[in-house]
């Protein structure tokens, strides 16, 4: 049985003759977002906003009819964009999973299950991009833009920073990220 980085002998026909080749075998890491049930989920909690990577496991948390609940946009982003539009695909699409109620985020209309397009003008390709976009921003407000033309939300940066630890404590979240 072939293992990662080993070679497998194969015979193919080219120009009417047999040709023997050795093909390298490797683990395909490109589909890791489609199923990773054996590791704890990644998340980032900020001002009551809970962000997580888009994955098949995340979508299956929507229930038995998760593919219908998720909608075509999220399914396309997870399963198809990397093949149809590789230049626009993201290494680790990030979702706003839910919003934990607190006065700092009370005016937000978008409450979760949406793809994050950019934060503070920076395109979000991974959880690391998201965290960096929040932590490096020095403006008075955070601007979070969502995919599928869902619009944007704003958070007062100072109020969000001040409320973050209280929100984590209220909801029993020990770490702001995992």
Spans of model-derived segments:
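C-terminal recognition in membrane/secretory proteostasis and scaffolding
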Residues: 1-178
